[in-house]
Amino acid sequence: MNRSFLRYSLALCATVAIMSGCRSSAAKAPTPAGAGTAARVVPAAVTPSNIALGDSIFNNGSCQNCHGKGGVGAANAPALDGKAWVQLKTGSFEEIVGIINSGVPADKIKDPKRTRAMGARGGRMALTDPQIQAVAAYVYTLTHK
């Protein structure tokens, strides 16, 4: 019985030591820059290939005519590269997709300096669903760096 107790005690101590070591490693793991207290979950559609395609569509299509190259803003439409959303509440990926899909009618534009409507699905570009996902991925990266 004495040997059994000793084995049990050693096993228990080893388990506690291992668990303590795992716990302290996790506690010391670096927090990603800008993550604050909780790490941000990147939407599944925000992939390097989607971002590259979205960049190409945005900056070579009619998006940049209004929003400026790189989404820096222009006379006709707001900047998309900051945290000050004009039409969106949160700037979530889903919200960005929704705006690209439905557009923004002139009477719904919240900035009095800008009165030009944003066409649904990129207006004349008539973006496909995969292209909308790509443009949304690109725009998402402009504000979620």
Where would I find each of the regions flagged by the language model?
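Sec-exported extracytoplasmic/periplasmic mature domains
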Residues: N59, N101, P105, A137-H144
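Bacterial signal peptide processing site
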Residues: C22-S25
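The canonical Cys-X-X-Cys-His
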Residues: G54, N60-K69, M118-G119, V135-V139
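Sec-dependent bacterial lipoprotein signal peptides
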Residues: M1-S20
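Proline-centered turn/helix-capping motifs that create local helix->coil transitions or kinks
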Residues: A27, P105-P112
